[in-house]
Amino acid sequence: MCCYFIAQIKINDADEYQKYLDGCDEVFTRYKGEYLSVDGNPTVLEGEWDYTRTVLIRFPTELDFSLWYESPEYQQILKHRLKAAKCDSLLIKGLDE
């Protein structure tokens, strides 16, 4: 069953965040991730929205997600995002295919 990683990001240090982006794609594609949306200006329908970017990523399985997120390569670049931005994220299960 596929799963979706959703991240709401508020960037506070663009230069440090760029270091994260510079290394992210190479690691990401190695673990079967697929960007479905990266949006800096979503349409807010309800509530307040104080984020710079919203990201939606699909993984074929939760195992693929875990292998990516917990990989030494990703953990090495993750430190840049943690320094540069506030991020609220979650993992949700897809519907049976």
Which residues does each predicted region cover?
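Short S/T/G/P-rich N-terminal loop/turn motif that feeds into the first structured element of a domain
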Residues: 1-54, 58-70, 74, 93-97
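Electropositive, surface-exposed helix/loop patches at the edges of structured domains
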Residues: 68-86
